[in-house]
Amino acid sequence: LGKAPTTDDLKKLSPNEIHLTIKNLNAGYGKMEILHNFDLLVNKAQSLCLIGPNGAGKSTILHSIYGFTNIFSGQIEIEGKEITNLSPAEKLKSVGIAYILQDNSVFPDMTVEENLLMGGYIKDKTDESYEEAERIFEKYERLRNRRNQPAKVLSGGERRLLEISRALVMKPSVLLV
């Protein structure tokens, strides 16, 4: 009780195929270090929920994985490939990391369809994106009925659905929410 789990403890919790590995990560914003010797192992197809009080470092962990923080030391890997110092765009293209921001990230003046297709443009796979977008429109009538309208007409819940759908169009191997 009261101590952080060791890497061996984490391996016992994630004995299968490790997808995401964080080793001895020291990261933060500017010169301020928020994470100190942080370790994490996540299996392929595993979901993980970070729970803790305000200021505990949950967002900093996600930001570090995606590339929004300064990494002072340590390593982040996806299936054994080091990605620690890659840009967010490189992480998306090379290992498939997508991030849904906490705040609204819908482009209000673009149509629902244009918003949905943005994920594919970022990943340079527009043909696949059109197919995925059609699949999403088939599944979600609310988005389908507004596909040619500006996204600003969507309710808060519909905007969140659009953000999540846009991330899924990219077919990420890691989805940070």
Language model features: what each stretch is:
Residues 51-53:
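The feature captures the beta-strand-to-loop junction immediately N-terminal to the Walker
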Residues 74-82, 93-94, 128-133, 138:
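Conserved ABC transporter NBD signature motif
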Residues 66:
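Helix-to-loop junction immediately C-terminal to a conserved catalytic motif
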Residues 30, 110-131, 139-141:
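ABC-type ATPase nucleotide-binding domains, specifically the catalytic core motifs of the NBD
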Residues 171:
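Conserved catalytic motifs of ABC-family nucleotide-binding domains
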Residues 150-154:
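Conserved ABC ATPase signature
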